[in-house]
Swiss-Prot record:
GO cellular component: ribonucleoprotein complex; ribosome
Keywords assigned by UniProt, alphabetized: Ribonucleoprotein, Ribosomal protein, RNA-binding, rRNA-binding
Provenance organism: Limosilactobacillus fermentum (strain NBRC 3956 / LMG 18251)
Family: Belongs to the universal ribosomal protein uS11 family.
GO molecular function, one term: rRNA binding
Function summary: Located on the platform of the 30S subunit, it bridges several disparate RNA helices of the 16S rRNA. Forms part of the Shine-Dalgarno cleft in the 70S ribosome.
Pfam (any one): Ribosomal_S11
Protein name (Swiss-Prot/TrEMBL): Small ribosomal subunit protein uS11
PANTHER family on file: 40S RIBOSOMAL PROTEIN S14/30S RIBOSOMAL PROTEIN S11
Length: 129
């Protein structure tokens, strides 16, 4: 079967002033997604995408690099101000927020939206190292 050549969609440059930066920080990785106010994705990045593998993905430095990469993508679309929503218990939370501020995006609000169970499912067993 013949494959089509060069039929990929071109990325349309949007002009978005304000957005929401969703930082999902787990124990193993940090994901940053920058959306517009409605929730449509503008830019995203993660520690794994940038080449960090294994235990290096969970470091604050990897979260900082991922945050800078996502912020640069969003600024190409004209973004200037962001609200930050942080979710999860990971180590890259603060460094990701700081990296957003240093790249030139103005952070207007920081919200912690970590889901807290009302005694939901049983947590994983304690590690014995």
């Amino acid at each position: 079967m013949a494959t089509k050549k060069g039929t990929r969609k071109r990325r349309v440059k949007k002009n978005i002033e304000t957005g929401v930066a969703h930082i999902h920080s787990t124990f193993n990785n940090t994901l940053i997604m920058i959306t517009d106010v409605q929730g449509n994705a503008v830019a995203w990045s993660s520690a794994g995408v940038l080449g960090f593998k294994g235990s290096r993905k969970s470091t604050p430095f990897a979260a900082q690099m991922a945050s800078e990469a996502a912020a640069k993508q969003a600024m190409e679309h004209g973004m200037k101000t962001v609200e930050v929503e942080v979710k999860g218990p990971g180590s890259g939370r603060e460094s990701a927020i700081r990296a957003l501020q240093t790249t030139g995006l103005e952070v207007t609000a920081i919200r912690d939206v970590t889901p807290v169970p009302h005694n939901g499912s049983r947590p994983p067993k304690r590690r014995r190292v």
